[in-house]
Amino acid sequence: MQPRVLLVAALLSLLASARASEAEDTSLLGFMQGYMQHATKTAKDALTSVQESQVAQQARGWVTDGFSSLKDYWSTVKDKLSGFWDLNPEAKPTLAEAA
């Protein structure tokens, strides 16, 4: 065989193998995209079912009630402690009075 024929045959085989590899990469990419779409849908469905479940609604109610109680407690403490300091700036001694 002539060297040109061998060179052309080698180039054609390299080109064919590159095309086959490219096709495999494309199919792998498509498979991964499909898998990720399916995983995303599954995760969204699971999150929706958890959010809609009765236990989640009850837990949200407990958290809301807890924050309300905390606000009420803080308001009570603040009211009780406000008697310990005078908010009137005129009642504070000045430096001239202290000396």
UniProtKB/Swiss-Prot annotation:
Key words of the record: Chylomicron, Glycoprotein, Lipid degradation, Lipid metabolism, Lipid transport, Secreted, Sialic acid, Signal, Transport, VLDL
Subcellular location: Secreted
Chief subcellular location: secreted
Site note May interact with the LDL receptor, residues: 41
Residues the record marks as carrying a glycan: 94
Record GO biological process: cholesterol homeostasis; lipid catabolic process; lipid transport; lipoprotein metabolic process; negative regulation of high-density lipoprotein particle clearance; negative regulation of low-density lipoprotein particle clearance; negative regulation of triglyceride catabolic process; negative regulation of very-low-density lipoprotein particle clearance
Stretch list, region Lipid-binding: 68-99
Record Pfam families: Apo-CIII (PF05778)
Gene3D superfamilies, per database record: Apolipoprotein CIII (6.10.90.10)
Keyword Lipid metabolism: yes
Post-translational modifications reported in the UniProt record: The most abundant glycoforms are characterized by an O-linked disaccharide galactose linked to N-acetylgalactosamine (Gal-GalNAc), further modified with up to 3 sialic acid residues. Less abundant glycoforms are characterized by more complex and fucosylated glycan moieties. O-glycosylated on Thr-94 with a core 1 or possibly core 8 glycan.
Gene Ontology CC: chylomicron; intermediate-density lipoprotein particle; spherical high-density lipoprotein particle; very-low-density lipoprotein particle
KW Lipid metabolism (keyword) present: yes
Signal sequence region: 1-20
GO molecular function: high-density lipoprotein particle receptor binding; lipase inhibitor activity; phospholipid binding
Family: Belongs to the apolipoprotein C3 family.
Role played: Component of triglyceride-rich very low density lipoproteins (VLDL) and high density lipoproteins (HDL) in plasma. Plays a multifaceted role in triglyceride homeostasis. Intracellularly, promotes hepatic very low density lipoprotein 1 (VLDL1) assembly and secretion; extracellularly, attenuates hydrolysis and clearance of triglyceride-rich lipoproteins (TRLs). Impairs the lipolysis of TRLs by inhibiting lipoprotein lipase and the hepatic uptake of TRLs by remnant receptors.
Database matches in PANTHER family: APOLIPOPROTEIN C-III (PTHR14225:SF0)
Protein name: Apolipoprotein C-III
